[in-house]
Every structure is written in C-alpha cells, then in structure tokens.
Amino acid sequence: MLFLALFLFACGESDPDTNHDGDENGEDKEEELVFVSLDEARLSGFELYEPTEGSAARLAFDAGITSYLDKITKVAHHIDERYEGEEGFTFDLAEGPQCMRGDDFSVSIRDRGSKDLLLFLQGGGACWSDFCLAVTKAPTNMPRPLVLDPELEANPYASFNAVYFPYCDGSLFAGDNIVPEDDPAKLEKGLTERVYRGLANLSAGLVVAKARFEDPERVVLAGSSAGGYGTILAAFLVRYVYPDAELIIVNDAGVGVAKDGEVEFVEKLLTEFGAERFVPEDCAECFVNGHITPLIDYFLERDPNARAAAITSWYDYIISELFMEIDKDDFADALDIETTKLHEKFPDRYRRFIYWGEKGTGHTALLGNPSGLIGTGPIAVEMPGGVNVAGLLNNLELLKFNELSIGEITLAAWLGAMVENDLDAWGDLMVPREPEEDGDGG
C-alpha cells in the first residue's frame, strides 16, 4: 500500500500547474513571502576564501562550484511551531536558487545543540530531454523520513543538528543551466524552459548551514536516490564549507552506476545540466566507463578525512530499469565491478551495504516513507508518458534502515558504527545476488 500511495500521490499532483494548499496540521501553504536580510534571520553571509593548494577544500574552489555561496543576501524566514528548534528559509529567485519550473526553493533546519551535523539531500527523480520524472516544488518544512526522525531511537543521527535540502530542479543537485523545453505537451501548458539550479540550491542551503552550525566536529552528508547521486558532487562543496570536519558520506540508492561503456549518456546529462564545467580538469577521463563512480575515487583520493558508504539493492528497479533503461543484471554487474574497485582502493574508507530486501529491486533504505522522495505540503511531480505502472508498483520497495539487516547488524546500527569509525562493526557487507534458501537475504 505504501508504494500505491506513493504512486497515486505523485500522479494526483503530476500537473505542474496544480498547487495544493496546506491544512490546519501545519502543512505548507501558499503565501506572500517577506524577505529580510540574513542578519534579521540570525544568519550571516558566506565569505569566499582561497584554500591552500593541494588541500581537499581547494577542489571545489578550482572546479568553480563555489560561485553561489556569496550571492545569498536575503531569505524569507519562518519557524515551524510544531517542532522545537525547526526553522525554514526560502530564497530570493533573483539570487539564483529556484525549482525547475520557477517556484521558490527552501531549506529547513533543526537545532539540537549538537556538535555533529546531518545534511540530507532529498530524492525525487531527474529530468532531461529524453526522460523526465521529477519533483518540481520544495516544501518549506522538514519532513519525517526515518533518517530525519529525531524521536526514532534506532536513528544514528537522531541527536544531530540537521539541514534538509529539498530537491526540485531535476539536476541531481549539480545543475546551472536553462534549457528550452522540448516536450510538446509541456509547451502547450506554457512551460517553455527547464531551469536547472541544483548548484545554487545546494549552495544556498550550505550558507544557512554554515551560519547556524559553524564548526561541527562531524558532518554526515547523506542523500537518497537523486540525493544519493547528488552527494557525489556535493561532497566537494561541503568540504569547502567545512574544511576541518570529519566528512561522512552516505549514498543511498544513487551510488554512481549509470550505463556501462556509454560515456555519451553521462556527457549528455552533464551538458544539459550545465555541470560539465565543474568536472576537475585532471578528471577528464573520469566518465569514460559510462559511470560516475570514478568521481568518488577522485574525491576520496584527495580527501583523507572523508569516508563513504554505498547502500543499494542488487537490482534497484527505479535506477536500472526505469531511469537508466538497462537490464537489471547489467546493472548488478556494473554495481559489483565499480564498487569493488572503490572498496579495494579505499578498504577502510569506502564500504558497501548491498541488500536484498523482499525482491532484490528495492529503492532507498534511509527513508521508510515517501516524504524523503516527494517532501510534504504542496507537491508537484512531473511524470513521463508510457511509464510501466505495473512494473513500478510491483518493484518499488522503500526499505527501513532500522529493520533491514545483513547478518546480525541492521543498516541503522551499521551507519552508527560508520559515524564512530568502528571498522569492525562497519564492515563491507553484501548479500549474494540471489538469496539462499532459508538464508539471510538482507
């Protein structure tokens, strides 16, 4: 029923011209925004700096992805009265951040008085000229997927300060481009362009994060689905913003596998999103195998104070068959090869949790409910024609990290061990590609 609810929720609001007001329970409502200076919102502007040559923080500076950090000067600020310590910030469209169809972009924070910080990148599809299934609005309040639930005892990040980054521009948090719309059905509705502002949105959220949580000891950068893919480039910018923190990257269902041998696919996405210029000059060969995983290699090699987790099912239906349109066995082959290379090169800093679930096609394990993919409040989801509805409903499975286990350890406990850098408990765990009879399929 969860999967049916997710699909119906998306389809019910798939018209990008449709807005839904909130209700008495505190959901978001359309209202006129009142912008104030950062000072009035108890924030401060970001001051760009030039990092030391050869430092990990220098990577983002040299790649040119820091350009939006000092552009944010005003926000519309609101306090979520339902939950203590939670606030939201909406940004001025003129300063860069926005959703794909021109709606406002917002982030939410939770202050728990912690020395640790969770940055969570929401999932929600992707949109390019050949395929578009994407969320196109950003909620102003923080949802409650498992990873953001401060009351869930098993949540290893429950006590962390948190920043929630909605996802609404279809560019995997990497875009910086405006592309003319080429879908006749959307042109008929007056939608003439796709605005990719993932980098500006990510930057705006990090400005808020830095202002409120200036010097955390540990930063967990986590993302699910599109947010998982988003962590790959976001890690560079997060390191620039927090040069001294332990950086713990948790990639859930967006581990960097794409189309094996099809470099043109990756290049097309980068070009359309306007992100090709952010690829480091000495990483020009990073995508020759058709995957994005070499960029993870590039980053970890240059940032010894970062470690990363790859969490996925063997046959993730949403990534393999829906978005990549590749055979699930080809996906599993590439997943095995690409992640093995990373683990063998960084055995203590890159580890996997590859599970089976009920069907082996599960998608995401940090969420447990759809709010981590589509947010809450006014939602707009653009759906492509010809989607295999039966396949989607039959294969979509949102796992729960407090219940999913391999052997004796749950994913939640495994992630807790990762935070503590307990290399014994944070093992490299993979179930067989086909579950054994009466065995633990994860």
Where in the sequence are the language-model features?
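C-terminal His-loop and adjacent cap/lid subdomain of alpha/beta-hydrolase
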Residues: 12-17, 26-442
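Extracellular calcium-associated, cysteine-rich motifs in secreted modular proteins
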Residues: 22-24
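Sec-dependent signal peptide recognition
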Residues: 1-4
